[in-house]
């Protein structure tokens, strides 16, 4: 039986339940609460209060999201796009990506090593490896450097 989110207490409880599972951005949390039937008049004050109490923190969400995606082998371009699709401001995304302590070059090499482990032998293999790494979110410049056997760290 679905819970009715028609009171401030019910909306707050639902928001806290979602935040207990993992960090959420404000836009994502608002969308999930609307999907569960809460009205904007109840959602906004509840989220404002959670933010004041430090339970809803965009910077903590960004840090958590970036770390999670980086551990999964995704590069900065893909992470940037996913965060933008989730409604986060570009300036905040850029700040968080700049502050993260991920060595994107080392991560690119590790993702490539796990998947391919050897330099491409012909143009077809090079294109295949390049497409895979580009899909994962790495820059064409970094990919080209790696696949051409140069490590300009």
From Swiss-Prot:
UniProt family annotation: Belongs to the RecX family.
Function description: Modulates RecA activity.
Protein name: Regulatory protein RecX
Subcellular location: Cytoplasm
GO cellular component: cytoplasm
Keywords in alphabetical order: Cytoplasm
Main location: cytoplasm
Family annotation (Pfam families): RecX_HTH1, RecX_HTH2, RecX_HTH3
Keyword Methyltransferase: no
Keyword Transmembrane helix belongs to the record: no
Transmembrane segments: none
């Amino acid at each position: 039986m679905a819970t009715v989110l028609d009171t401030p207490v019910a909306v707050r409880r639902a928001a806290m339940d979602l935040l207990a599972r993992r960090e959420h951005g404000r836009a994502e949390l608002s969308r999930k609460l609307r999907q569960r039937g809460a009205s904007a008049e109840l959602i906004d004050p509840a989220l404002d209060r959670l933010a004041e109490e430090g339970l809803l923190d965009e910077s903590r969400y960004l840090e958590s999201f970036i770390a999670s995606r980086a551990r999964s082998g995704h590069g900065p371009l893909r992470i940037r796009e996913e965060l933008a699709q989730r409604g986060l401001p570009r300036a905040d995304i850029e700040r968080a990506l700049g502050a993260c302590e991920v060595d994107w070059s080392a991560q690119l090499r590790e993702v490539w090593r796990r998947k391919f482990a050897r330099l491409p032998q012909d143009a077809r293999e090079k294109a295949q490896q390049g497409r895979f790494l580009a899909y994962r979110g790495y820059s064409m410049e970094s990919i080209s450097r790696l696949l051409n056997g140069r490590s300009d760290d």
